[in-house]
Structure formats: C-alpha cells, structure tokens
Amino acid sequence: MRSKIIALLLLLSCMLNVNAQDDNVRTKSVYVEVLGPSNGIGLTYDARFNENSRWGYRVGFGFGYKRTSDIFGKTSVRGYSVPVGVNYLVGGKKHALELGAGLNAGIYNNHDFTFEPWYIETTPGNKKQIGWKTKPIKENKFGMFAYTTVGYRYTSKKGFQFRAGVTPAVAFAFKGIHDHKVVLAPYISFGKAF
C-alpha cells in the first residue's frame, strides 16, 4: 500500500510539473531575421510589455548589402540599421498572427559613380571635350523607413520560434540610395523564446 501511495504521489507530481511547463508563458525571444524590418539580416530582441499582454516591442540590429554592375561600373550599398517597433499577437501561445509597425533607421555606406567630362588638351591652355568618364563616389548617408508587418508566429513548448510574413514599408530620408518609395518585402526568422 505504501509503495502505491508513493507511486501515486510521484505520478501526481510529474503531472503537475508537466502542467506547469505547459502554462509557462514565454514573453521574450531572440531571433535571427532575414529581410523584412532587418533590411537584410538582423538579430532582434522581442518581448511582451507584461506577462499577460498581447502587445509587445522589438529592437534589433540589421545589416544589408546590395551590389549592382553595368557597363559603366559597379555600385554597392552597405547598411547598418536599428529596427524598432511594436507588435500585437492574435491567437494562441503556440500559433499566432503577428501584426506590427515600426521604424528602421541606419547609416548607409554608398559606393557609386558619377559622370564627368573627359577633356584632352588641343593646344596649350585649350581643352576639348572628347567624351565622358566615370568618377567613383564614396559617402555615408542616413536612411530611414517606416514599416508594418503581417505574419505568422509559431512558438513551440520548448521555446523554438519561427516567424514568416510580409513587410510593407515606406522609405524616406534615402536621398540617392533607394530608388523605390514603397517596398513589399518578405521576412523569415528563427529563434528562441524564453
């Protein structure tokens, strides 16, 4: 009888322990994000405002790189940015619709070129333009875009987190860097919730 009571208590203890783990609310996470608000690849910290809140915030660091080439030369842009935002989760603890909005501000190292006249000296002191040549330009510029996110968020019982969705964004303060004013970019992320 005594062994049955001990076995019953151990079983009850295990069930309570498992139940307590299921009720564990994971309000914080760290994830690696590709595209979307990170503007390339980024590392982000995300948290709920409190344990029972569906509202949360995110802050991270992003890096983006773009390179193009044509018959005139090569251009590249490296971006180092900080995406910050708020989000709201609709659904359960495991599967949720994530709706968010925020700003991404950063410094963009722009390597570009411009055209300048190409002259030859015809006689001493006289020049004649015979064409155009490219001149490299290197400059750092400030850039910013406002974004929203609409996506799916999966958080397992053990803390694995997967996110995927789309980021509509409006670029401003990107003079000479970004050719598009409105961008629609997908995103995907993998991380750990705790």
What is each PLM-predicted segment?
Residues 4-14:
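Sec-dependent N-terminal signal peptides
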Residues 182-194:
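Outer-membrane beta-barrel "beta-signal"
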Residues 23-25, 34-38, 73-79, 139-145, ...:
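Transmembrane beta-barrel outer-membrane domains
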